[in-house]
Amino acid sequence: MAPGRAVAGLLLLAATGLGRPSEGPELAFTEDVLRVFGANQSLSAAQLGRLLERLGAAPQQGALELGQLHFNQCLSAEDIFSLHGFSNVTQITSSNFTAICPAILQQLNFHPCEDPQKHSVKPSFSEVWGYGFLSVTIINLASLLGLILTPLIKKSYFPKILTYFVGLAIGTLFSNAIFQLIPEAFGFNPKIDNYVEKAVAVFGGFYMLFFVERTLKMLLKTYGQNDHTHFRNDDFGSKEKAHQPKTLPLPPVNGVTCYANPAVTEPNGHIHFDTVSVVSLQDGKAESSSCTCLKGPKLSEIGTIAWMITLCDALHNFIDGLAIGASYTLSLLQGLSTSIAILCEEFPHELGDFVILLNAGMSTRQALLFNFLSACSCYVGLAFGILVGNNFAPNIIFALAGGMFLYISLADMFPEMNDMLREKVTGRQTDFTFFMIQNAGMLTGFTAILLITLYAGDIELQ
């Protein structure tokens, strides 16, 4: 039991002795309070002030003028003494301590000394829908990044950029789950339940093992030899390739034949964005382009994997929308934190989905269209999340989203972050560079969510 609640209970029991002889349990409880907070079985005005501070009922600023007493008037220790006819130098003993107990309990129950502006006020209807719609729109723009970033895939620096964003996604998703979503599911308050330090320890345990494991691998690994892997993948943008993978022909459309040079698909399902390009052949003349088949092949001729990815991504985005909507009904900072985590995760995932859809036989326009349509399911999830959050306790949604965030960060993106560099890393220096980039991404995401959690009560979104 919290110390403040224990003291409040003692005060209540002591107050029950009002008007009765000071004997029995009432006297024992009174003497306990006087022994802890007073001296020589008596209580001065200053010591009463410390008792009020311990109970969280002390005025934050100077004493207010006493007028007609009412339930929401903030009283200092001197005010309580004055109202009961005691001077500031009077020492309260057990015989008259019960007289001031009702005043202390009144201050403790109604908290009139708290700043009303500090109370957490739920966002208004327009704020929830406005900020929620804006956040989902920004997140959905990530689904269009494939078209913009496809030309950068073959750049030598692209693996470093992608590694940082994958690490950032891991840090934000994992931290948002342990700092925000899971505690909210259990009804914890970071200012009262003091779970933040324990959540930091949870992340610390994960990060410590990651750091030790990667360090040992760098120290013990013999570079320059072929690593034993269950798959092979080409280097990102490598110029030393002996030959390019064979292109896959797509059905002709309007007299134009498209050939998709697919991403390398490993047996374990990992996609490496190194050989994505589309060329067209018309009248026997080769022409490199992003894709001249704007209409694309028939939907029935597109690989099944494309529809599986689209449907799974739509469900994933629906859950994301649920989490965002429920978070914004709680507070704007909670919604912002969840949105940041989802945005960081969507960037590498949407890029990967775009490449998979191209590999399955879609044209660029079709891949963008279906990737964007699956992303729009986030709006549906947002609406459900807001409705549930406003009418019911959203704890179940927070628990569901927290578990999903843990799975995506630890079981999905974390192995992907390591596997994507298996053959890219050719020396200890290169391995160390990517290791530092991974650390920078994860620690950036962790720090951002931690700061939002710690200072959520001091940040105001107007």
From Swiss-Prot:
Q: Which InterPro entries match?
A: ZIP, ZIP_Transporter
Q: Name one Pfam family in it.
A: Zip
Q: Which UniProt keywords apply?
A: Cell membrane, Glycoprotein, Ion transport, Lysosome, Membrane, Signal, Symport, Transmembrane, Transmembrane helix, Transport, Zinc, Zinc transport
Q: In what way does activity depend on pH? A: Optimum pH is 7.5 for iron transport.
Q: Where in the cell is it found?
A: Cell membrane; Lysosome membrane; Apical cell membrane; Basolateral cell membrane
Which reactions does this protein catalyse? Answer: Zn(2+)(out) + 2 hydrogencarbonate(out) = Zn(2+)(in) + 2 hydrogencarbonate(in); selenite(out) + Zn(2+)(out) + hydrogencarbonate(out) = selenite(in) + Zn(2+)(in) + hydrogencarbonate(in); Mn(2+)(out) + 2 hydrogencarbonate(out) = Mn(2+)(in) + 2 hydrogencarbonate(in); Fe(2+)(out) + 2 hydrogencarbonate(out) = Fe(2+)(in) + 2 hydrogencarbonate(in)
Bilayer disposition of the protein: Multi-pass membrane protein
What is the protein's major site of localization?
membrane
User: What GO terms are given for molecular function?
Assistant: monoatomic cation:bicarbonate symporter activity; zinc ion transmembrane transporter activity; zinc:bicarbonate symporter activity
Would the keyword Transferase be found if you checked this record's keyword annotation? no
**PTM field:** N-glycosylated. N-glycosylation is not required for proper iron and zinc transport.
Q: Name one GO cellular component term.
A: apical plasma membrane
- Provide Cytoplasmic-side residue ranges: 154-160, 213-367, 412-431
**How is the quaternary structure described?**
Homodimer.
Full protein name: Metal cation symporter ZIP8
Supply the source organism for this entry.
Rattus norvegicus (Rat)
Q: What taxonomic lineage is listed for the species of origin?
A: Eukaryota, Metazoa, Chordata, Craniata, Vertebrata
User: Gene encoding this chain?
Assistant: Slc39a8
